[in-house]
From Swiss-Prot:
Its EC number is 3.1.-.-. This is Putative pre-16S rRNA nuclease. Belongs to the YqgF nuclease family. Could be a nuclease involved in processing of the 5'-end of pre-16S rRNA. It comes from the Bacteria. One of its GO terms (cellular component) is cytoplasm. It is found in: Cytoplasm. The keyword Hydrolase applies. GO terms for molecular function: nuclease activity. InterPro entries: RNaseH-like_sf, YqgF, YqgF/RNaseH-like_dom, YqgF/RNaseH-like_dom_sf. GO terms for biological process: rRNA 5'-end processing.
Length: 218
């Protein structure tokens, strides 16, 4: 692929990526995608290095019901690595109708172009990739019951309990929890807990406590 055409953009090229384990759809340009194609995933890093983009936009794959999937975390892992060198974003694919329609067609190059387009047309569905983790000094005794970690920023927290649920809408934080073996949801379940540890929305969480349950707010 000859990318000399884009050398004069002064670092303002934007790249959109529809990530897959074997191949990726990529689209690049300034305000509009001027080229879209499919490349082997193994070549993605070198492709982006040569293009020297100002921003990278990854489509965030969620299930149609809005749940995290294994493909979500594979994509987030790659996006997080790129975020250490480039300004990187994740855009929820479901919230763009045209992107949703491509699921049946599965044209990776077109998908990347639509992800590119969604960044400009509906930036509210896109989130800049940063490291959301924060070390929290919290000593907990073993809990003989069910625990909820809600938007809690420390995936390394050592907690012993019969069951631990994690809920966060931050896909990067969810990825780090999944690496530690947790099942992570984006929405609260209709259940009650013996202990809730929360990073936000504490008042709203009281209804999810069991009788004599405890709520810990940061």
């Amino acid at each position: 692929m000859d990318i000399q055409l884009f050398q004069g953009y002064g670092g303002k090229v934007i790249v959109a990526v529809d990530y897959g384990e074997r191949k990726c759809g990529v689209a690049f340009g300034e305000i509009l995608p001027q080229k879209s194609l499919v490349i082997p995933t193994k070549n993605l890093k070198e492709f982006i290095r040569k293009l020297k983009p100002d921003k990278i936009i990854f489509g965030l794959p969620l299930s149609m019901s809005g749940k995290y999937t294994q493909q979500t975390f594979k994509t987030v892992a790659v996006a997080f690595k790129f975020s250490k060198e480039y300004e990187t974003y994740l855009c929820d694919e479901r919230l763009t109708t045209k992107i949703g329609e491509r699921i049946s067609k599965r044209d990776d190059a077109v998908s990347a172009a639509l992800i590119f387009q969604s960044f400009f047309e509906n930036s509210s569905v896109c989130e800049k990739v940063t490291d959301p983790r924060k070390k929290v000094d919290l000593a907990l005794e073993k809990v003989d019951g069910e625990v909820l970690l809600y938007e809690f920023p420390d995936p390394s927290l050592n907690i012993e309990a019969r069951e631990v649920d994690v809920v966060t809408k931050n896909p990067v934080l969810a990825y780090f929890y999944s690496k530690n073996g947790y099942f992570v949801g984006r929405e609260l379940w209709e259940k009650k807990y013996d202990l809730i540890i929360s990073g936000k929305n504490c008042e709203e969480l009281k209804k999810y406590l069991k009788e004599n349950g405890r709520l810990v707010c940061l």
